[in-house]
Regions:
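N-terminal non-catalytic structural scaffold regions of very large proteins
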Residues: 1-309, 324-326
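Primarily the HKD phosphodiesterase
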Residues: 10, 14, 56-59, 74, ...
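Generic beta-strand/beta-sheet core signal
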Residues: 37, 86, 101, 155, ...
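A generic structural motif
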Residues: 212-226, 313-314, 340-344, 367-373
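Conserved phosphate-handling catalytic cores of large alpha/beta enzymes
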Residues: 375, 383
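Active-site PLP attachment segment
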Residues: 379
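Conserved small/polar residues in nucleotide/adenosyl-binding loops
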Residues: 387-396
Length: 396
């Protein structure tokens, strides 16, 4: 971690310089404006404050730190507001933490462009959610004076310590490990802005049990990776042209949907298996479409009455995986289906556990990989019976 820190600090500085000097000005040239709260005009400020009351305030939970309330748990990669409030009657200072609810709300809140008051107004105006919260802290701490607010972000160790050889039930062991990870691994990075007072920094370091080498002082906004959400804006001129991919010519007449739609005649259709029996096919993804090659192969295997069984390894799968849907359909069609599901896919463990259970409930025989190793490879084996053609069973 110390070696990483040495390389990371200059990169973080460069990142903030690029954000201030290049990205924000370039976005503004294309009428995309990211405003700080203090830059808002009266109409924009009123709109933001109203939005806070209606949409943000109800999901906030401020947590104070005092002898009766220990330092709250801070989840991995969460963005937080550290508030220092003062009781005007006693003069007592108190620290409180407010978590920025990014799972419920977008990191950047769009402000109606007609409120800009400019003749050539930006088309897209937004403000960071944490700024909306920070400048409305008085609503969370009525009767208190807000001495200051500061943002901070925590990164926790996400490694799962699993001893495969000692686990009677790998899935159960993994679920227990995931619960421990959610409860929080050791803090390996604390990010704070350079304007945060030293006493607040020390309070955070003590409360989070952070060493000096795990403290990163950032000269700018935290969590700049959330800027990725701006790519959803309808600005086609700023987007690289997407590559559509193609269907290999050799499989052009092997698409079941074309047969179903009448785009090709039954005597023109060639199943993928009949094509592969004659020649090997080398695919280049993403230039060759996955949907009309591998996905079509699995779908035809699931529905072909000559297919006896399917065996496949699964590492990372989407939440609406068509491959898994095809495997389930194959099992329901009476085929012998076996899936090796690698449960230990980093940050996809929950997803893989749910899919493994769903596959088992559908009649698929599921195994969980090789003890002590992680299975990354993507392999599928399909056994097809050709007894009606007096040919031996083939494996594809």
């Amino acid at each position: 971690l110390l070696a990483i820190r040495e390389r990371l600090i200059p990169l973080l500085r460069e990142q903030q310089v690029h954000y201030r000097q290049h990205l924000r000005p370039k976005l503004l040239e294309h009428k995309v404006e990211l405003l700080d709260y203090k830059q808002l005009n009266d109409d924009q400020r009123q709109w933001v404050d109203d939005t806070f009351q209606t949409s943000v305030f109800p999901v906030l939970t401020p947590l104070a730190v005092d002898p009766a309330h220990p330092f709250p748990f801070v989840s991995n990669l969460s963005l937080n507001v550290a508030a220092v409030v003062v009781d005007p009657e006693t003069g007592q200072r108190q620290f409180a933490r407010v978590k920025v609810p990014q799972k419920n709300l977008p990191r950047f809140i769009a402000i109606p462009s007609n409120l800009s008051g400019q003749e050539h107004k930006p088309v897209h105006t937004a403000i960071a959610l944490e700024q909306v919260i920070a400048f409305n802290l008085k609503e969370l701490f009525p009767g208190m004076t807000i001495e200051g607010h500061y943002f901070f972000r925590v990164t926790r160790d996400a490694d799962l310590e699993l001893r495969d050889l000692e686990a009677d039930d790998l899935m159960l062991a993994l679920e227990q490990g995931l619960r421990k990870r959610r409860m929080g691994g050791e803090v390996v990075r604390l990010e704070v802005p350079n304007e945060m007072p030293q006493d607040v920094v020390e309070m955070l370091m003590t409360g989070l049990n952070v060493e000096e080498e795990d403290l990163y002082v950032i000269d700018g906004p935290l969590g700049l990776d959330d800027l990725l959400s701006l790519t959803a804006l309808p600005l086609p001129k700023l987007k690289a042209q997407s590559h559509g991919g193609q269907t290999p010519t050799v499989l052009a007449r092997s698409q079941q949907h074309l047969l179903d739609e009448g785009a090709i005649k039954p005597d023109e259709f060639r199943s993928i298996f009949s094509v592969i029996r004659r020649q090997d096919i080398l695919l280049h993804h993403p230039y060759d479409l996955f949907s009309t090659t591998v996905e079509e192969f699995i779908n035809q295997a699931a529905d072909d009455p000559q297919v006896m069984g399917i065996k496949m390894t699964l590492y990372r799968t989407s939440k609406d995986s068509p491959i898994i849907a095809a495997l389930i359909r194959a099992a329901e069609n009476g085929k012998q289906v076996m899936a090796l599901v690698e449960l230990k896919a980093r940050f996809d463990e929950d997803n893989n556990i749910q899919w493994a259970r769903h596959l088992e409930q559908s009649g698929v025989h599921v195994v969980y990989g090789v003890l002590g190793l992680k299975t990354h490879t993507k392999i599928v084996l399909v056994a097809v019976s050709y007894t009606h053609l007096t040919l031996p069973t083939r494996r594809f």
